[in-house]
Design a protein with these regions (language model features):
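Short alpha-helical segments that sit at the start of domains
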Residues: 8-40, 199-240
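Basic, Lys/Arg-rich alpha-helical nucleic-acid-recognition elements, primarily the DNA-binding modules
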Residues: 1-2, 26, 31-56, 73
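Short amphipathic alpha-helical interaction segments
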Residues: 59-81, 253-268, 273
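Minor-groove-contacting beta-hairpin "wing" of winged helix-turn-helix DNA-binding domains
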Residues: 88-96, 276-284
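Phosphate/adenylate-binding glycine loop and adjacent helical scaffold
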Residues: 140-144, 266-269, 303, 307-335, ...
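Extended alpha-helical scaffolding regions
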Residues: 108-221
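Short, amphipathic alpha-helical interaction segments positioned at domain boundaries
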Residues: 95-130, 284-319
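Short capping segments at the starts of secondary-structure elements
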Residues: 47-54, 241-256
């Protein structure tokens, strides 16, 4: 670790990588961050519980400023979940799993050593189930294996981590319940490497003649995000056309504004053109098939990685019990999420190198974006 990482000097920048899991509209405490003072307070409180006066003395800042900042960080955006918690003794402590650089690198290395085996196993699994993937009843006029695999890639990537999670739960953290909140954060001090990505979804109802529509998109190193959680689908001209074009849409029926939206929708991968017709390019399935949508890929966590996952779980459990405070052990799953972050990008690159997966040009396309509908 650098000197700054060990004990930051006031006004030196601390670069955190903080992820979220769940529904951020309930209250995302990351929205209260971004100030140098808050970054330093979080760092100090991640090492030990401290009072406002102790923090002020450590940072050479007025106690009044620190007290104001502490309340912001404790309350978060909804008054229920912040990055800090206030203890009974009046001190403040970190309220989410936050690894320092050295600990994050240790956690990542536990998974990194398993990546060659993970990639080999996933590749074999894909080849063995190719026809089954292609037989899924998508509603698109046409589809291909590449789009299907981009839809499935996170589930395939998570199979090893899910196996580790099961073993951690059964063997090391069996009596510890999940935290009872709709949204959680977890993170680490930037190690200089960028890993993984996310998955955002949006729902809308009674649009374009459909009862319910759910849209999802992933974003990773190779794929840029189309939209965020809670995106207003009904007001998105490109997505409305993608919804209308599932069974085909005659271009001649479109207004000039709709034709402009169509051109943009083709450019970003929502649609493709065949003669005078537009068709939806992102994968579309019936909501009635939701339970089956990832069913094939889910099988990968059933027995394919048991031996290797047991070794990983043992090492990770030791790290968690060493570096995570007892009151945060309910969040142990997020420590596992941090540890497993190198896997997704590594798997994607391995499959691209083998010609099994092809990324979209410039990072924007139909890849990694899909729609589930209820008529």
């Amino acid at each position: 670790m650098t000197d700054t990482a060990k004990k930051p000097v006031t006004l030196n920048k601390i670069d955190y990588i903080i992820w979220g899991s769940g529904n951020p509209t309930w209250g995302d405490p990351r929205e209260t961050l971004g100030r140098l003072l808050s970054d330093h307070i979080i760092w100090l409180c991640s090492k030990k519980a401290m009072s406002a006066s102790e923090i002020a003395a450590e940072l050479n800042v007025s106690t009044v400023y620190v007290e104001d900042e502490l309340e912001i960080l404790r309350n978060g955006t909804n008054g229920k979940y912040g990055v800090l918690r206030r203890l009974d003794n009046g001190r403040y402590a970190i309220n989410f799993i936050l690894f320092d650089k050295e600990t994050a690198e240790k956690a990542h290395s536990i998974y990194t050593e398993q990546i060659p085996n993970i990639c080999k196993t996933v590749e074999s699994f894909i080849e063995a189930h190719r026809e089954e993937y292609l037989a899924f009843p998508y509603l698109n006029r046409k589809t291909d294996m590449n789009l299907i695999l981009w839809q499935q890639i996170r589930t395939l990537s998570n199979a090893f981590s899910d196996s580790v999670t099961r073993i951690l739960k059964e063997k090391y953290f069996s009596g510890i319940p999940k935290p009872d909140r709709p949204f959680s954060i977890f993170g680490y001090v930037n190690t200089g490497k960028t890993y993984g990505g996310g998955c955002d979804g949006a729902e809308t109802f009674n649009v374009c003649g459909l009862k319910k529509i759910r849209l999802t998109n992933i974003y990773v190193t190779r794929i840029k995000k189309h939209f965020h959680c809670g995106h207003n689908v009904a007001n998105d001209g490109k997505l409305r056309l993608a919804i209308r074009a599932i069974d085909g849409l005659d271009i001649s029926t479109l207004s000039e504004i709709e034709k402009e939206h169509a051109a943009k929708a083709i450019e970003c991968g929502y649609l493709y053109r065949d003669g005078n017709m537009l068709y939806t390019k992102i994968l579309v399935s019936n909501s009635a098939d939701d339970e089956r949508l990832f069913g094939i890929s889910e099988r990968l966590k059933n027995g394919y990685f048991d031996s290797e996952a047991a070794k990983t779980a043992e090492k990770l459990a030791e790290l968690i019990k060493t570096f995570v405070p007892d009151y945060l052990l309910c969040d142990w799953r997020f420590a596992n999420d941090i540890a497993g972050m190198p896997v997704l990008d590594a798997l994607i690159e391995a499959l691209i190198e083998r010609g099994i997966l092809a990324p979209p040009e410039n990072g924007i396309g139909a890849e990694g974006c899909w729609m589930q509908i209820e008529k």
